[in-house]
Amino acid sequence: MAVKIRLKRFGKMRAPYYRIVVMDSRAKRDGRAIEEIGKYHPTEEPSYIEVASERAQYWLSVGAQPSEQVAAILKITGDWQKFKGLPGQEGTLKTKGEKEAFVAPEKGSVIIPEAITKKASKSEAAEAEAETTEAE
């Protein structure tokens, strides 16, 4: 049985999410997988990549062939270099930086918060109409 490591598509139209799976090469793209070893979300910035390195190393060692896309992902995470014994095993994976916590401006600050206009009450609206009719 020829085993491949490839992507299994999830998500909606124009919003793909993929799982990195090990499956028989004759199975359908979204068919039954032998094992799920990672996730790939290409629409996020930077792309979200999560690979169970130990399991990827195991499947590569027993002869599973990665697809072109998965091979590129494994090179980014450094798993391919680790398997082949090449330099650069730390990978080039970029992660999101943590956002700073919101800090409200102090009372003596020069920053003026945006004004929130309240809706006019019914009586004020009626007075405004009366003034416009009197002016005519």
Swiss-Prot record:
Alphabetical keyword list: Ribonucleoprotein, Ribosomal protein
GO biological process: one example: translation
Cellular-component GO terms for this entry: cytoplasm; small ribosomal subunit
Pfam families: Ribosomal_S16
Single GO molecular function: structural constituent of ribosome
SUPFAM superfamilies found in the cross-reference section: Ribosomal protein S16
Classification via InterPro entries: Ribosomal_bS16, Ribosomal_bS16_CS, Ribosomal_bS16_dom_sf
PANTHER family on file: 30S RIBOSOMAL PROTEIN S16 (PTHR12919), SMALL RIBOSOMAL SUBUNIT PROTEIN BS16M (PTHR12919:SF20)
Assigned protein family: Belongs to the bacterial ribosomal protein bS16 family.
Protein name (database record): Small ribosomal subunit protein bS16
